[in-house]
Amino acid sequence: HRHRLLASCRILGIPAPTLTLPTGGPDRVVRAEVSAEGATISERSLGTVRPVSLVFSQVLHEPYRHKVIERTQFDRTLEAAREAGADDGLLLTKQGHVAEAAIWSLYWWEGATLCAPPLGLGILPAVSRARIGQLAGPLVERRVTRAELEGKSLIVSNAARGVVPVSFLEGKSVPEQPETARLQDAFWP
């Protein structure tokens, strides 16, 4: 995260901050917000991690390359998904390709091959995605439509929670994949 943060600061012309991270203990989410005025650090408890339920968002995915606090598309997606009884929503591009969820990177299994939406869709090059690429071998990047995800085993990831299986997509049960458990176990060194 630190490397991505510093690279984004360089590209966006923001002075690199000196970060002193809190020491709240294990299972904490630490958030650094950096602006031209300085940096703020916050932390919160991780909470329980369980399989997630996803729905498709009506909000279109707008490409971005840096993790910034302007997250309107993701906030609207997450709010609508939770109102619908799901944990998160999947955003589609204007061309109808699945991009990512509001707080998760998305992957699907095609046999023993792990696939992910291409970074070229303008999704964040997530730290968790890089870790999964180390563990699963190179991810196969594929453009996929919502219909093409039906019946596939799905997983999501983020740096706070690691690898998490998807239990339901649009209210339909998602099949499990044995390789998911191996990724979950190996994600945290």
Feature locations, PLM:
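Short beta-strand/strand-turn micro-motif
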Residues: 97-104
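Short conserved beta-strand segments at catalytic cores or DNA/RNA-binding microdomains
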Residues: 105-109
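Short internal beta-strands
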Residues: 115-119
